[in-house]
Each structure stands twice: as structure tokens, then as C-alpha cells.
């Protein structure tokens, strides 16, 4: 963003007396540049103008989920930068931020901040709380865990299947960050790597999970939830547009996804959980984006290998993704 004279004075990062869910009708994409007149224009001759939407000037309101004043954050293009801005506003180490939810302070995995933020969304940051170590006997092949990650190096539990091995261990809850398995640190690992490690643990053996739960306010200390059913709540922002965060490249302001895209993303996310034990709406959205204009499964497989080769998706999974996108296109929900 260009700097210049005559800009409005920047608001302080913390706003003590603001309501928790304020109206922000003044949010917009960018501001007029401070330079004007022919002299300024002549001095810039020959230089290409900066891309207008490279870093859209959007201000979001945020609180710590366990309770805090309201903060204002702006100027981030990915999740890692977002966590840094939140940490700066609340004078915390960035490593303390575990994940964020949109428009609720509760550990609600259906409101988890992923790759998109509605322009009117209110961000609640969940920070590290109590650490715990739990021994688990793997009596069945499937533990009943669905893993996701925050895009910044922390993998955590998004869902616990009812009646599963993990469901019977009350110390383990949705929202717990998985720090280590049998002493092996998982900090910096992606969700699919953690899910694979859990799957490869031998049946009939005991293993140790080192976990960190989100810090809780008094009104949040209650019986743990197994997480909502996929698609049981709004997955994307409710504002007039959405800020799309990418792990590579700049953030962009986009229209809300179409009904086809929203349903396709939901179906692909379900397939990720079924095949790989993870949920990741940003990954699902990327796969839908790659596949919506492809003519056959082979073209989709080629696009996925080129962009997402690290995941090594099996052929049957790619075929099911192709089918899910096709079903959503023709309205077979």
C-alpha cells in the first residue's frame, strides 16, 4: 500500500469498549492513493502501477476466544501472517495462536477459519491452554479421529467418531493440538502426515499422545463435543465477499462461491475425510478449482499431480473427486 501525507490516523490495535460483533459497513478494497497532480504523475512515468488488489486494505475485528478486548487487524495475505497480526495486537508470541473460528468463541469445527474469510466475519483466536499426555491402547485399526491443521504448522483434532477408540477417552477433545506421538514431535507437520502416522501405528499396542487443548473461559468448560456433522453449519463467510488466503501467492478478494462450488467443496471435503482422515476446506476448494473445467479424470489427475503432488492421491480417490464435482455441476446433491 502506498504511504503518503494526509492519511487518516491509524486506529489503535485494541479497542476496549467496542461491542463483540460490530458493524463494519465501511470496509472496502483499497483506498485512493495519496499522490496526485501532474508532477507526481510525471515522476512515475515508465513505472508500472502496483496491482490494486495485491494487498487489499481490509480491516477485521478479532478477540481471543477465552475473553479479551476487541482488536483490529489488517495487512495479512496468508494464515501465518494473520496469526502474527493477532499476536501483535494482543502482545502474544505468534506460536501461542492455535487456530481461529469465525463469528463464535466456541471450539466449533464447522466455523473454523480456513482459506476464506467473509468480509464481515468476526475472528476469534484460540490460544494454547493446558498440556496433557494420554496413553491410548489401539484396539482397532481405526481410531475415529479426523485431523486438520491451521496452515501454520499445528495439526489438531477436528472430529471424533462416536463410539470409536478415542471417543471412550474423555481426556481427548475436539480442538486438541497433537504435539507428539510416542515422543516424535509433529510441530510443522501437515494434517495428512499426522493422519498417516496414526494409521500406521500397530494394532494391539499402546501409544502416547502429547496434546495441548485451547485455553477455555469458564463458560466453555463443559462436556466435550464430538464436532458437528459436515455441512451442518455455514462453511464460508457471510459477508458480501470473501478474502481468499493462499499458502502460495497473495490474498485476493473474491465473490462468495456459487451454489455448485459450495456443494462440490463440501463433497470433496467429505472424500478427504473418508480416504485420508483429514478435513481441509481450503484444500477441497483448490481441488474443485482445478477440476471444474477439466474434461475427464485423467486431466484432473494431471492437474492434481502438478499442483498437489505431495499428497500422492490414489487413483480411486481422484476418480471419486471427479464424480463429486460432476454431480455438483448437474445438481445431484
From Swiss-Prot:
Compartment list: Cytoplasm; Membrane
SMART domains, alphabetized: PDZ
GO process terms (BP): cellular response to interleukin-7; chemical synaptic transmission; endothelial cell migration; G protein-coupled receptor signaling pathway; glutamate secretion; negative regulation of proteasomal ubiquitin-dependent protein catabolic process; positive regulation of cytokinesis; positive regulation of melanin biosynthetic process
GO molecular function, one term: identical protein binding
CDD domains with a match to the protein in the record: GH2_GIPC, PDZ_GIPC1
Modified residues (Phosphoserine): 68, 222, 225, 232, 247
Biased segments, Gly residues type: 27-39, 228-240
Presence of keyword Metal-binding: no
Pfam families referenced in this protein's UniProt entry, alphabetically: GIPC1_GH1 (PF25083), GIPC1_GH2 (PF25082), PDZ (PF00595)
Keyword tags: Cytoplasm, Membrane, Phosphoprotein
Residues of the PDZ domain: 133-213
Tissue-wise expression: Widely expressed.
InterPro entries: GH2_GIPC, GIPC1-3_GH1, GIPC1/2/3, PDZ, PDZ_sf
SUPFAM superfamilies registered for this protein in UniProt: PDZ domain-like
Main location: cytoplasm
Family: Belongs to the GIPC family.
PANTHER family given in the database record: PDZ DOMAIN-CONTAINING PROTEIN GIPC1, RGS-GAIP INTERACTING PROTEIN GIPC
UniProt-recorded name of the protein: PDZ domain-containing protein GIPC1
Source organism of the structure: Mus musculus
Amino acid at each position: 500500500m502506498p504511504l503518503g501525507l494526509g492519511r487518516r490516523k491509524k486506529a489503535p490495535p485494541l479497542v476496549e469498549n467496542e461491542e463483540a460483533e460490530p458493524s463494519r459497513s465501511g470496509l472496502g478494497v483499497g483506498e485512493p492513493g495519496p499522490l496526485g497532480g501532474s508532477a507526481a504523475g510525471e515522476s512515475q512515468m515508465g513505472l508500472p502501477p502496483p496491482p490494486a488488489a495485491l494487498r487489499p486494505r481490509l480491516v477485521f475485528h478479532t478477540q481471543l476466544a477465552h475473553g479479551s478486548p476487541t482488536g483490529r487487524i489488517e495487512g495479512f495475505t496468508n494464515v501465518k501472517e494473520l496469526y502474527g497480526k493477532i499476536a501483535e495486537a494482543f502482545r502474544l508470541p505468534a506460536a501461542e495462536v492455535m487456530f481461529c473460528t469465525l463469528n463464535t468463541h466456541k471450539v466449533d469445527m464447522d466455523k473454523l477459519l480456513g482459506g476464506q474469510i467473509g468480509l464481515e466475519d468476526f475472528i476469534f483466536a484460540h490460544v494454547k491452554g493446558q498440556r496433557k499426555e494420554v496413553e491410548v491402547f489401539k484396539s482397532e485399526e481405526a481410531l475415529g479421529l479426523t485431523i486438520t491443521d491451521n496452515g501454520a504448522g499445528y495439526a489438531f483434532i477436528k472430529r471424533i467418531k462416536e463410539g470409536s477408540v478415542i471417543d471412550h477417552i474423555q481426556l481427548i477433545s475436539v480442538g486438541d493440538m497433537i504435539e507428539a506421538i510416542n515422543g516424535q514431535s509433529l510441530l510443522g507437520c501437515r494434517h495428512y502426515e499426522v493422519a498417516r502416522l496414526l494409521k500406521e501405528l500397530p494394532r494391539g499396542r499402546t501409544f502416547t499422545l502429547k496434546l495441548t487443548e485451547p485455553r477455555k473461559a469458564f463458560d466453555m468448560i463443559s462436556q466435550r463435543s464430538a464436532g458437528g456433522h459436515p455441512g451442518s453449519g455455514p462453511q464460508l463467510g457471510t459477508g458480501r465477499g470473501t478474502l481468499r488466503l493462499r499458502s502460495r501467492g497473495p490474498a485476493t478478494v473474491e465473490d462468495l462461491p456459487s451454489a455448485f462450488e459450495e456443494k462440490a467443496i463440501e463433497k470433496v471435503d467429505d472424500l478427504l475425510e473418508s480416504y485420508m482422515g483429514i478435513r481441509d476446506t481450503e484444500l477441497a476448494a483448490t481441488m474443485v478449482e482445478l477440476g471444474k473445467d477439466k474434461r475427464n479424470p485423467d486431466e484432473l489427475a494431471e492437474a492434481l499431480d502438478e499442483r498437489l503432488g505431495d499428497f500422492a492421491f490414489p487413483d480411486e480417490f481422484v476418480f471419486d473427486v471427479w464424480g463429486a464435482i460432476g454431480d455438483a455441476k448437474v445438481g445431484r446433491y
